[in-house]
């Protein structure tokens, strides 16, 4: 039997996940232990520029990384996060926090989301070993031939290698 928080059944975990990494997976696993239904939503955000991975690749990587969790669903969206939260009937939006600067930006967004929709954001802190991991940094390290295999699932490491070449160990 899964321990749940109150009677909450559905949470939304939105992000670009370009690429998904071990910090994201940790947040998904914690949410999956706390809630009955976790919706991981990959955003299509043209304002962020062209992602490294296509939407389909990102969703496939998320599916592979969360295959061991039976209460995780994957979707995508290009609307406001709160609109998707309403659509999937999410009780909360879940966001991971690595460092204090994450809290500053995420709190502002959480307050705005609550103001326009009433949806509350729940923050889950990352484990210390994941606090330094960021998708942007993973892409940069991989682009210059660095090894990111300790920060991402093996499928992500393989796809990064196919895009940038094998790690040089530097």
What are these regions (language model features)?
Residues 2-170:
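Nucleotidyltransferase catalytic core that binds NTPs
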